[in-house]
Amino acid sequence: MIGSFLTRGLVMVLGYAYPAYECYKTVEKNRPEIEQLRFWCQYWILVACLTVFERVGDAFVSWVPMYSEAKLAFFIYLWYPKTRGTTYVYESFFRPYLSQHENDIDHSLLELRTRAGDMAVIYWQRVASYGQTRILEILQYVAAQSTPRPQPPQKRGGRANQAPAKPKKAPVPQSEPEEVSLSSSSSSSSSENEGNEPTRKVSGPSRPRPTVTSVPAADPKNAGTTQIAQKSVASPIVNPPQSTTQVEPMQIEEVEGEAESGNENPNPEGPKETVMEETIRMTRGRLRKTRSEESR
């Protein structure tokens, strides 16, 4: 058996190349013979039909043994000068079949042309509409990309990159009246005296009282340090003079009540009494000075 590759090469040479060269020689003669031209036209008609059908028939008949060799032999049979098989096959099989179905074939070809034209128009419209929509989408996309969009504020990580926040102004605390705090012994004694003596009510709005630091009961050893601490008592906070005459009697009464409470509660320790008396005297003196200055 000849290989399929070699068989295909021989079919191309002996079935197409050599007959084409013989047809060329016949056409280029000074006086071409009509019979020779007719013969080669019939040959090429049969070869064209074989080429069309072998594309489909090879898938079903190529498994037959010696199929490629038989096809090569048939091509040689058609043009070989001694056999001249083209004339026999054309006149016996091909021409009678075509003459019988020529009208049907022409009608089918006309319908096929009409349908092909309609299908071409329909597909052209679809392609045009699709291309138009796609072009519009592309133009819209390009226009959207060209217009600048407002960029959202980027969140910067880390505390170092954050802008320093403006310090909020703290609300100014309102001055509240501060109560005079004394030692435990003096407070207890003053509470007892308050139970016995009626309290005096002062009309008008309450005013802030002067702050007096508490003087705890100190040991005799630490008497020197307590005296130094008592001398550094802060001066009373003086607000704008608004009805000072009502505030001053209250301050004097409180100081006198504290002095009386200090005198009523005898303390066996001498240094403590002297410290309290000195504190009361200093406070009275300062109150009198402030009162005289405000009255001026």
From Swiss-Prot:
The protein's name in its UniProt record: HVA22-like protein i
Compositionally biased tracts (Acidic residues): 251-261
Family stated for the protein in its record: Belongs to the DP1 family.
Biased composition (Low complexity): 180-193
InterPro entries per UniProt: TB2_DP1_HVA22 (IPR004345)
Biased composition (Polar residues): 223-233
Positions with biased composition (Basic and acidic residues): 270-281
Region spans: Disordered: 146-296
Origin species: Arabidopsis thaliana (Mouse-ear cress)
